[in-house]
Design a protein with these regions (language model features):
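Conserved helicase motor "Helicase C" RecA-like lobe of SF1/SF2 P-loop NTPases
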Residues: 151, 453-475, 672
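Walker A/P-loop
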Residues: 28-50
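Conserved helicase motor
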Residues: 87-98, 109-120, 451-456, 472-488, ...
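Short amphipathic alpha-helical segment within the helicase RecA-like ATPase core
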Residues: 69-77, 97-99, 459-463
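N-terminal cationic and glycine-rich segments that engage phosphates or anionic surfaces
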Residues: 34, 87-432, 436-442, 461, ...
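Conserved pre-motif I regulatory segment
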Residues: 1-34
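Conserved strand-helix element at the start of the C-terminal RecA-like helicase core
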Residues: 57-69, 86, 280, 440-462
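Pre-Walker A (Motif I) flank of P-loop NTPase domains
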Residues: 28-34, 56-57, 133-135, 445-446
Length: 680
C-alpha cells in the first residue's frame, strides 16, 4: 500500500523547496541531510511530505516520550490510512538491579509495566513483520535496546486461512509457543480461550479479539470481534497471528542456552576461586543455578534478560537485536531535535555498562549480562541507511555528517516572525517581569519563564501566586502525564504563567504564549548555551505578539549568537512577507492530550486522567519514614492515597537519579502505606 498523505494544508513558504531538496537527496542516495527549520515552520509537515514522496518505511526518533507522543499524533493525522506506530519504553517505573559495594547493598530490579504502551510496541513490531512498506514508527531511544531477533519472531508467526486443514490442538500448541496463555474464564490481552470448536484469541497487539471456528479438522471461519460485545467487526480469508511477546524462544534454544550458561558458570566460579574470592564464587554459583532451575521448570526467571545472549545465539560482545533490525535495509531514519537526541543515543551504552560492572565484578551476574545492553553509538551509526537530522539548532556532529547538505526552512506558513529579543538588566528583574505578566494576562496571552534551578522555579511560582498571578511550575520531577495536563491548562487559560527549569525548550507547541522570559541569561553553561537560548526563545515564535526578554547584566557570546541569528531570520521573514503581501496570522490550534491512544469499535480510548498538580513552595524531600509517624494511623483513605502517590513520585525520581537505596526505601514505604490503606 502507498503512503496516503491527508491534510487540508498545502506546502507554503519554504516548505515546497525543503520538501523538493530532501526528496531529491533521498532518491539520489544521499546518506545524511539536515533540515534546519525554525520553530513553527512546519518541520513535521515537511517530513510527512518527504515520506509520502519517497515511499520508504520510516523510523522517526525523538528524545523523550512526551515529544514522541506528540509526533505520533501528528503523523497519525497525516497518514490515517497507513500504519503509524508508537514504540517507547513500556515502564511506568523502572529501578534496575544494582549493587553498591561501599555499603554492601544489593537492590533487586523493580518495575511497573504500562500495558497500553506494551500493546503499542507489539503493534509496531507486528506491522514491520508483516512486510508492508507503508509503516512509520515513532520511537524514543528505546529502539536501540535489546529485544528478540527477527528470525525468532518470524518463526513464531501463526498463519491460518479459511478452509485450511489444521488440527485444533496443534493450533493451540502453536499459540502457547507464541507466548499466548490459555484462560477460559478471563480473556485478557495475550490470552486465549476454547469453547467447543471455537477459539477466541485476545491478541497482544490489538484491542479486539480474533475468533477462529472449526468444522471437524478444517477452519470454518476467521473473524475479528469486539472484545466487549463480541459482535463481528470483520471477516478474513486468511490471517497472521503475531507473537504475544517480543522475546520468544524454542525448546531447543532453551536447552542449548542452559548448557552454555552452565559452562560459563563453571568458568566464572573457577575464576573467582583463583582470585581467592570464595564468597563471590558461592554467590554466583547459587544465583545462576537457581535461575537455571526456574528456566527449566517455568521457562523464565527473574532477570532472564541477562541471559539473552545465550537464547539469541550471539557471541560475547556481539550487539543485541533491536527495533532497527526489523526495518528493511533501505529504510529512512528521521531524528527529531537531533542536537539533543544524538548525544542521548551516545550516552546510553556507558550508563548501562557502569551499572552492570559491579554486578559482574561482585558475583551477582555472569559476564554475559554485559551483552544485554543498548547499542553502542558506532553500532547505531552502522545501521543507518539514510537519515534526516531535524533541528532548529543542529549540532556540529549533524553538520559534519551531512557534509554541507543543509536545507533551511525559515519562512513560516502563517507569516509569523521570529520573536524580538530584548535584553534588560537583572536588577529588579522579578518586579519588571511581574509588570510584563500583568500586561500579557490582560490580553489573554500566556507567559513562559525559565529559571536556572528547580528550586528557583518553585519559589518564583510561589512568589507569583502571592501576588495574585495565576501560575504553575514544571520540571523533571513532575510526572509525564501531569506535564501534559499542565501544558493543556496553560493553553486553556487555567493559569497565565508557567515557570520551568529545563523543559521549556524543544518541541513544545504553545501558540498562546506571547512572552518568554529568560532569567539570568548571562550565566554561561548548558542551560544558557547558544542552542538552549535559541530553543527557549523559539517558544514565543508561534504567537503574533511573540517577544523574548533576556534578563542579564552582560551580553555573553551565546546571547549574541542567538540575537544575531534571530535578527538574520527576521530580516528574511520580513522580506518574504513584504514580497508576497502576507500579514502574519495567529496560530489557532485545538487543545488535546498528546499521549497516544488505541482505537476500539466505539471510538477512542482516552489516556488515564492525570492528577491535577497544585503549585507549592519548594520543600526539601524528607527521608522515607512516613509510616513511622503516628499521624499516619489517623489518616483517611484519601490522605493515605495521596501519600502513596507522592511517595511513588519520590521513588521514581530517586531511581532516575541512580539513588537506588533511597528508591528501595520509598518502595518499602509504599508497600506499608498500601497495607495501611487496605486495612481501612
Amino acid at each position: 500500500m502507498e503512503f496516503q498523505l491527508t491534510s487540508k494544508y498545502k506546502p507554503t513558504g519554504d516548505q515546497p523547496e525543503a520538501i523538493s531538496q530532501l526528496t531529491d537527496g533521498i532518491r539520489q542516495g544521499v546518506p545524511a541531510q539536515v533540515l534546519l527549520g525554525v520553530t513553527g515552520s512546519g518541520k513535521t509537515f515537511t517530513v510527512a511530505n518527504v515520506i509520502a514522496n519517497v515511499e520508504k518505511p520510516t523510523l522517526v526518533l525523538s528524545h523523550n516520550k512526551t515529544l514522541a507522543a506528540q509526533l505520533y499524533q501528528e503523523m497519525k493525522g497525516f497518514f490515517p490510512n497507513n500504519a503509524v506506530e508508537y514504540y517507547v519504553s513500556y515502564y511506568d517505573y523502572y529501578q534496575p538491579e544494582a549493587y553498591l559495594p561501599t555499603t554492601d547493598t544489593y537492590i533487586e530490579k523493580d518495575l511497573a509495566i504500562n500495558e497500553d504502551i506494551d500493546k503499542l510496541r507489539l503493534s509496531a513490531v507486528s506491522a514491520l513483520l508483516s512486510g508492508r512498506k507503508d509503516v512509520i514508527v515513532v520511537s524514543s531511544v528505546s529502539c536501540i535496546y535489546g529485544m528478540g531477533g527477527p528470525t525468532a519472531l518470524n518463526a513464531s508467526i501463526i498463519s491460518i486461512r479459511k478452509g485450511q486443514k489444521l488440527d485444533r490442538n496443534e493450533f493451540l500448541r502453536s499459540l502457547v509457543a507464541s507466548l499466548y496463555v490459555r484462560n477460559d474464564i478471563d480473556l485478557q490481552r495475550g490470552n486465549f480461550r476454547v469453547k467447543g470448536d471455537t477459539v477466541d484469541i485476545a491478541m497482544a497487539y490489538s484491542d479486539n479479539v480474533l475468533r477462529v471456528a472449526w468444522w471437524d479438522d478444517e477452519i470454518d471461519s476467521i473473524e475479528e470481534v469486539d472484545s466487549v460485545s463480541f459482535h463481528t467487526i470483520e471477516t478474513f480469508e486468511e490471517y497472521k497471528i503475531y507473537p504475544a511477546n517480543l522475546f520468544v524462544t524454542t525448546k531447543e534454544q532453551t536447552e542449548t542456552a542452559i548448557r552454555q550458561i552452565q559452562d560459563d558458570l563453571v568458568e566464572q566460579v573457577a575464576f573467582f576461586k583463583e582470585q581467592g574470592e570464595e564468597i563471590k564464587a558461592q554467590r554466583i554459583k547459587e544465583r545462576v543455578e537457581y535461575d537455571m532451575e526456574m528456566i527449566k521448570e517455568l521457562g523464565h526467571c527473574s532477570g532472564i534478560e541477562n541471559y539473552s545472549r545465550y537464547f539469541d545465539g550471539r557471541q560475547p560482545g556481539e550487539r543485541p537485536y533491536c527495533l532497527l533490525d526489523f526495518f528493511p535495509k533501505d529504510y529512512l531514519m528521521v531524528i527529531d531535535e537531533s542536537h539533543v537526541t544524538v548525544p542521548q543515543i551516545n550516552a546510553m551504552y556507558g550508563g548501562d555498562r557502569a551499572r552492570k560492572q559491579n554486578l559482574v565484578e561482585y558475583g551477582f551476574r555472569l559476564p554475559a549480562a554485559f551483552d544485554n545492553r543498548p547499542l553502542r553509538f558506532e553500532e547505531f551509526h552502522e545501521m543507518l541507511h539514510q537519515v534526516i537530522y531535524v533541528s532548529a539548532t543542529p549540532a556540529d556532529y549533524e553538520l559534519r555528517e551531512a557534509e554541507g547538505v543543509v536545507v533551511e526552512q525559515i519562512i513560516r506558513p502563517t507569516g509569523l516572525l521570529d520573536p524580538e529579543i530584548e535584553v534588560r538588566p537583572s536588577e529588579n528583574q522579578i518586579d519588571d517581569l511581574l509588570e510584563e505578566i500583568v500586561e500579557r494576562a490582560a490580553r489573554n496571552e500566556r507567559v513562559l519563564v525559565t529559571t536556572l534551578t528547580k528550586r528557583m522555579a518553585e519559589e518564583l511560582t510561589e512568589y507569583l501566586l502571592s501576588h495574585d498571578v495565576r501560575a504553575n511550575y514544571i520540571h523533571s520531577d513532575v510526572a509525564t502525564l501531569d506535564r501534559v495536563k499542565i501544558m493543556n491548562d496553560l493553553r486553556a487559560g487555567v493559569f497565565d504563567v508557567l515557570v520551568g527549569f529545563n523543559l521549556l525548550r524543544e518541541g513544545l507547541d504553545l501558540p498562546e504564549v506571547s512572552l518568554v522570559a529568560i532569567l539570568d541569561a548571562d550565566k554561561e553553561g548548558f542551560l544558557r548555551s547558544h542552542r538552549s537560548l535559541t530553543q527557549t526563545a523559539g517558544r514565543a515564535a508561534r504567537n503574533v505578539n511573540g517577544k523574548v526578554i533576556m534578563y542579564a547584566d552582560t551580553i555573553t557570546e551565546s546571547m549574541q549568537k542567538t540575537i544575531d541569528e534571530t535578527a538574520r531570520r527576521r530580516s528574511i521573514q520580513l522580506k518574504y512577507n513584504a514580497d508576497h503581501n502576507i500579514t502574519p496570522q495567529q496560530i489557532v490550534k485545538a487543545i488535546s492530550t498528546s499521549l497516544p491512544t488505541t482505537r476500539t469499535e466505539s471510538g477512542t480510548k482516552p489516556a488515564p486522567k492525570p492528577i491535577v498538580l497544585q503549585p507549592q513552595a519548594y520543600i526539601e524531600p524528607e527521608e522515607a519514614a512516613m509510616v513511622a509517624d503516628p499521624i499516619v494511623l489517623r489518616m483517611t483513605k484519601e490522605q493515605l492515597q495521596k501519600s502513596i502517590d507522592n511517595t511513588t513520585q519520590l521513588m521514581k525520581q530517586a531511581a532516575k537519579s541512580l539513588d537506588f537505596i533511597q528508591a528501595a526505601q520509598y518502595r518499602d514505604e509504599i508497600v506499608r502505606l498500601q497495607q495501611q490503606l487496605d486495612g481501612k
